[in-house]
Swiss-Prot record:
The lineage of its organism: Bacteria, Bacillati, Cyanobacteriota, Cyanophyceae, Synechococcales. It comes from the Bacteria. This is Large ribosomal subunit protein uL10. Pfam families: Ribosomal_L10. PANTHER family: 39S RIBOSOMAL PROTEIN L10, MITOCHONDRIAL.
């Protein structure tokens, strides 16, 4: 039995909501994947704030219609597609997809859209090579902490330097 119009509208509304919350969309050809493999991919993506949706291209076309951030996705809407919508950890999610593809050897990345721009295969691989969100945050925190420490040392050095200068001056005056 086919889907009802109400059911299709509900799916389109859900897709629009997911797209609004997403930073990146990756389109995969899922032909040949088993249910178990799709479940494996979905669980890998959950830890990286990603979600994998399998839906008809026509419904995705309706969901992106009128949304300038996602209109370039239209060129990828052919064949059997799974849509990976990533909310936060883009690098981690792309790594999870590539790791999954390496293990199963059944799925191909058709393309991706990030910040309203289609990405090439090499750009997608570059994103996967980026450190995770947590690692980047730790590096930034370390850098900020280093700057704060240097400022504190410099601020403490001013009174100490002034005291040494005054002491030297007073010793010269006594001589």
């Amino acid at each position: 039995m086919g889907r009802t119009i109400e059911n299709k509208q509900k799916i389109v509304t859900e897709l629009k909501s997911l797209l609004d919350d997403s930073e990146m969309a990756v389109v995969l050809d899922y032909k040949g994947l088993t249910i178990k493999e799709m479940s494996d991919l979905r669980s890998r993506l959950q830890t990286n704030k990603g979600i994998c949706k399998v839906t008809k291209n026509s419904l995705m076309r309706k969901a992106i219609d009128g949304n300038s951030n996602w209109t370039d996705l239209e060129s990828l809407l052919t064949g059997t597609n799974a849509f990976v919508l990533i909310k936060e950890d883009v690098g981690g999610a792309v790594k999870a997809i590539q790791s999954f593809q390496k293990e199963t050897k059944k799925s191909e990345t058709k393309g991706a859209l990030f910040e309203g721009r289609l990405l090439s295969q090499s750009e997608i691989k570059e994103i996967a090579s980026l450190p995770s969100r947590e690692v980047l945050m730790a590096k930034i925190a370390g850098a900020l902490n280093g700057v704060a420490t240097k400022i504190a040392i410099s601020i403490n050095e001013v009174p100490s330097g002034l005291a040494r200068s005054l002491k030297q001056h007073s010793e010269k005056s006594e001589s």
